[in-house]
Amino acid sequence: MSTTNKIYFIAGGNRGIGLSLVKELSNRKGTVVFASARKPGAATKLQEWSKSHSNVHIIKLDVSSLESANEAAQEVTKVVDAVDVLWVNSAVFHSFGPVVNTPDDVWNSHYKTNVLGPIHVYQAFYPLIKKGRSKIIVFTSSLAGSMGAFFPSSQSAYGQSKAALNYTMKEISFELQDEGFIVISIHPGAVRTDSAQEIVNQHAEKKPEILDLFAKQALTPEKSASDMLKVVDNLKPENNGLFYNYDGTIIPF
């Protein structure tokens, strides 16, 4: 494979925002895109896209398992020896209630996927990113994880997990700054995905303002992905450790 290609790995590239990232990137000239799915056989939209795009490689990955992350990295090394941009987009979001009645299993599942998951992917792919030319790591985060720009809505375990992810990003950016890495978090905006719509519908009766906000302001996955890529395409060393909004503005931690 040509060493002039720019190599991307998108963890969670089988639907929604992740799939839109895969599509836009793979339509660019000189790119190779690895897209992960927990169950590749069930990722029908990604499978269909890869059939017409030979530069897309589907990788099995369950981010909650370090073993799975290591196996995914090994699969990538069968094709390339470096990755330029690592984008961890995998996440769960099934917490839309107050802290007082959010059970342990909800906290644990969010932490396992949204915090340990990105850590597993980073640990497994660090050797590949270190060999890359761009050395960019992107974590898809959320405004829900910002305390400085607190959104007045009960998102308990989800918000806490994204706050922890932002801290993880900040620490990694510090640890890798002397190695030439650029590490950021980015909020994709309120995005019109199937999972987001389902959550909004579940809580529309008690929180009608959420339904209204979602209907008026939600982005399509394609728009969110395109805007975030504009941010990532223009990253410079001095941007290391920042928390971005999809439109390129900075979000306080």
Swiss-Prot record:
Top EC class for this record: oxidoreductase
SUPFAM superfamilies, A to Z: NAD(P)-binding Rossmann-fold domains (SSF51735)
Compartments where located: Cytoplasm; Nucleus
Top-level taxon of origin: Eukaryota
Annotated Gene Ontology cellular component terms: cytoplasm; cytosol; nucleus
EC nos: 1.-.-.-
Binding-site residues, NADP(+): 17, 36, 62, 89, 158, 162, 191, 193
InterPro entries attached to this UniProt entry: Fungal_SecMetab_SDRs, NAD(P)-bd_dom_sf, SDR_fam
Keyword Nucleus: yes
Alphabetically ordered keywords of this record: Cytoplasm, NADP, Nucleus, Oxidoreductase
CDD domains, per database record: carb_red_sniffer_like_SDR_c (cd05325)
Active site: 158 (proton donor), 162 (lowers pka of active site tyr)
GO BP: any one term: cellular detoxification of aldehyde
Primary localisation category: cytoplasm
Molecular functions (GO terms): oxidoreductase activity
Family, as annotated: Belongs to the short-chain dehydrogenases/reductases (SDR) family.
Protein name: Uncharacterized oxidoreductase C663.08c
Taxonomic source organism: Schizosaccharomyces pombe (strain 972 / ATCC 24843) (Fission yeast)
